[in-house]
């Protein structure tokens, strides 16, 4: 890859992005973008003719990782992860060809699991569990093609089952 390309805001001359330019004068390689205070906010990798490749990373202004999105030929493929402002994992989803596929897990800011759900072709499919922050099950449901089926089971914070709903 050839030269670096720096893009500045025309009004205040603040750095907006740095990218690499190939011999055909197209962006290729690592691209970094910055906020108005010139804090790094994202890093991506562009591969000639294939688009975004690898892990796209976005950052909070104070430098903590905000999310990681796995790309292959500009489509999301793999585990997408979002983080709380302190850097702890907030949620993770598995993607295949830009669609949620498989297990997804959400977390409280404490790090304890909040919910677990399953996806098929971008729709909720299968068991869905929601938890109290103490780790006890709070709700259990089942989905088929994005629609709830059957009963929802609810539990008190101490784990005692409290009701069923249709």
List the predicted regions and their residue ranges:
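Glycine/tyrosine- and acidic-biased, solvent-exposed loop/turn segments at the edges of beta-strands
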Residues: 1-166
């Amino acid at each position: 890859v050839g030269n670096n390309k720096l893009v500045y805001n025309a009004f205040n001359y603040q750095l907006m992005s740095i990218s690499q330019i190939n011999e055909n004068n197209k962006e290729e390689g690592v691209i970094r973008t910055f906020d108005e205070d010139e804090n790094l906010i994202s890093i991506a990798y562009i591969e000639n003719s294939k688009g975004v490749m690898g892990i796209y990373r976005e950052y909070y202004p104070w430098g903590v990782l905000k999310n990681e999105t796995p790309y292959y030929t500009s489509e999301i493929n793999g585990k997408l992860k979002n983080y709380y402002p302190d850097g702890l994992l907030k949620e993770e989803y598995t993607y295949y060809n830009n669609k949620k596929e498989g297990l997804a897990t959400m977390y409280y800011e404490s790090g304890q699991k909040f919910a677990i759900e399953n996806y098929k072709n971008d729709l909720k499919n299968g068991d869905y569990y929601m938890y109290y922050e103490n780790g006890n099950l709070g709700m259990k449901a089942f989905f088929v093609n994005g629609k709830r089926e059957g009963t929802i089971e609810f539990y008190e914070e101490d784990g005692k089952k409290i009701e069923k709903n249709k």
